[in-house]
Amino acid sequence: MSAVDVESRVRHQNFWFVACFAVLVIQIAVEYMMGRVPICACGYVKLWEGGVNTSGNSQHLSDWYTPSHIIHGFLFYGLAHLILRRKPLAAKLLLALVIESGWELLENSPLIIDRYRTATIALDYYGDSILNSAMDTVFMCVGFFFARRAPVALTVAIATFFEIFTGYIIRDNLTLNVVMLIWPVEAIKVWQGGV
């Protein structure tokens, strides 16, 4: 490979990574314009928020829903690998970031916030802080890069563990969240309310 080819390849890869960073910046800017709070209204930032039905949930760096975003990364890597097989890794990451950022914007819209509050146990959910939402996207990237390196069986095992563990501890996880958002089941809502 000639020096010109290497330089062209590096420039091409850099373009994709700049585009990835731009998606995250746009997500943050749009959430700010939507009126989302930058950090928790409590005025401080915690590494971990362990409460589920608390005012700090979805406001700090990580919480019980962080494993769901890591699983998003696993899933989005798989999708990108299938449909962008010949594209560079950064192009695959860009697809994952566009999907995750799109979800974060939708999740923090009045439509979805109201849906969560009426169909799930998240009665006091008012949306994520910008910091939490951005970290959700970063954790998706962690899952994406993990899935790229790890054997598929290990990735599936970790996703299964995350789902079972969070389901057991907080009676919620990615699967239950999707079910309750799309097709609420009263029995699940009652069970989740027992936390």
From Swiss-Prot:
Cellular component, GO annotation: plasma membrane
Topological category with respect to the lipid bilayer: Multi-pass membrane protein
Keyword entries, A-Z: Cell membrane, Membrane, Transmembrane, Transmembrane helix
Name this protein carries in UniProt: UPF0314 protein RL4541
InterPro entries, A to Z: DUF2585
Disulfide bond entries: none
Subcellular location: Cell membrane
Family: Belongs to the UPF0314 family.
Transmembrane segments: 15-35, 64-84, 127-147, 150-170
